């Protein structure tokens, strides 16, 4: 690399606009690569320096050049949410349909970065029906990301390919309306409910949007669906199977989930959401109500203690159809395991005697009642220990 090219790279890195202009006027190549094989304009984009990007483009920087990074430089601007830089690159001929190094359209990277960026790409020729290497369009990817649905971005994509988009389904057979009902996105119903000639659109499980709005307590959406059903002179159902139609929510299995509000637990919260989405009627069962925390001080375990705990567990699990024991950062107490004929020889965290005893007793009651049990992480240890499967550290 010659000295002037080094000076250009240094000036860009230091946001020295005047020096950049001076060097470009002197004939330094605006497509200069740095010592790592990266285009110098990439540094200007990383620095979010619109003025330097514009100068480089005006002096001939190629907006479609590919360097050692292999990703198009416009992708750098998209990831940085730099709308001004994106516009400048597109104005100079950047390809809005270019693929990244993983063979995915760049519009896919724009989806989580806001409606303005997606709109800019679409207005400059980005194809909303362009597919990635797995055959997914931007809208179908949004449908698969059921954790959230960006109303503005989704609506923008729908407007580009309206009829096809509104009938698009994800792998669960869900339409935009199903996802909007799940997440309480009233704006989607305001915009598009009237397009559908029935409210009884079913997914693969036979669930309609009304099922999800009722299940998750989105009453305003439920009201909108019922009103639309009246306009269409039809009955709104929550679930349609080959043999039955349900106007209200169908019977749901009652699931007990071991939990304590003060201790909390990420797995418990996540699992409750997942179970509700699978149609479960989930109720937290406080393991501290079975064996109080004070037991951690005494650590007393005998038949009297066990029987008292079992009686409380039976009361709390009465009427339940299944038990879920989620994980936490506490290991099964060795003395509790020993009492139930198990063996624990690991060291992953501090044991919780009271919780171990409470959940071991819950597992015993559930097994005696013939209830299915699911264990997650530490919950696996509880079940395995009760079943006398040794939990040993790796050799």
From Swiss-Prot:
Positions of the ANK repeats? 3-32, 36-65, 69-98, 101-130, 134-166, 172-201, 205-234
Q: Give the annotated active site.
A: 377
Lineage, top-rank taxon, reads: Bacteria
Cited SUPFAM superfamilies: Ankyrin repeat, Class I glutamine amidotransferase-like
Give GO terms: molecular function aspect only: hydrolase activity
The segment(s) forming the Glutamine amidotransferase type-1 domain are 272-395
Q: Which keywords does this Swiss-Prot/TrEMBL entry list?
A: ANK repeat, Glutamine amidotransferase, Repeat
PANTHER family noted in UniProt: ANKYRIN REPEAT-CONTAINING (PTHR24123), PROTEIN HOS4 (PTHR24123:SF33)
Protein name per UniProt:
Putative ankyrin repeat protein RF_0950
């Amino acid at each position: 690399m010659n000295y002037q090219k080094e000076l250009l790279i240094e000036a860009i890195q230091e946001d020295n606009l005047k020096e950049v202009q001076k060097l470009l006027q002197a004939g330094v190549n605006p497509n200069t690569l740095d010592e790592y094989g990266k285009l110098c304009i990439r540094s200007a984009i990383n620095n979010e320096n619109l003025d330097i990007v514009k100068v480089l483009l005006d002096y001939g920087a190629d907006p479609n050049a590919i360097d050692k990074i292999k990703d198009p430089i416009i992708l750098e601007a998209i990831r940085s949410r730099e709308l001004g830089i994106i516009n400048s690159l597109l104005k100079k001929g950047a390809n809005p349909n270019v693929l990244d190094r993983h063979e995915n359209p760049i519009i896919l990277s724009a989806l989580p970065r806001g409606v303005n960026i997606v709109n800019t790409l679409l207005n400059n020729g980005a194809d909303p029906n362009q597919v990635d290497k797995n055959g997914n369009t931007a809208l179908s990817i949004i449908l698969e990301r059921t954790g959230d649905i960006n109303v503005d971005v989704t609506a923008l994509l729908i407007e580009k390919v309206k009829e096809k988009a509104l009938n698009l389904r994800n792998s669960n057979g869900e339409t935009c309306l199903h996802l909007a009902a799940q997440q309480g996105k009233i704006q989607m119903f305001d915009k598009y409910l009237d397009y559908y000639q029935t409210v009884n659109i079913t997914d693969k499980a036979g669930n309609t949007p009304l099922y999800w709005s009722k299940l998750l307590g989105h009453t305003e959406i439920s009201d909108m669906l019922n009103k639309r059903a009246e306009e269409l002179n039809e009955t709104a159902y929550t679930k349609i199977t080959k043999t039955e139609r349900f106007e209200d929510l169908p019977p749901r299995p009652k699931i007990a989930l071991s939990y304590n509000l003060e201790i909390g637990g990420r797995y418990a919260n996540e699992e409750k959401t997942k179970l509700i989405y699978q149609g479960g009627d989930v109720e937290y069962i406080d393991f501290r109500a079975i064996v109080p925390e004070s037991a951690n001080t005494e650590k007393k375990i005998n038949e009297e203690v066990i029987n008292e705990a079992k009686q409380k567990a039976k009361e709390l699990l009465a009427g339940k159809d299944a038990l879920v024991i989620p994980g936490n950062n506490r290991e099964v107490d060795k003395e509790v395991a020993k009492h139930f004929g198990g063996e624990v020889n690991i060291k992953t965290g501090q044991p919780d005697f009271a919780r171990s005893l409470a959940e071991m007793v819950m597992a015993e009651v559930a097994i005696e009642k013939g209830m299915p049990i699911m264990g997650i992480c530490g919950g696996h240890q509880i079940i395995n220990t009760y079943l006398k499967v040794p939990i040993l550290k790796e050799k």
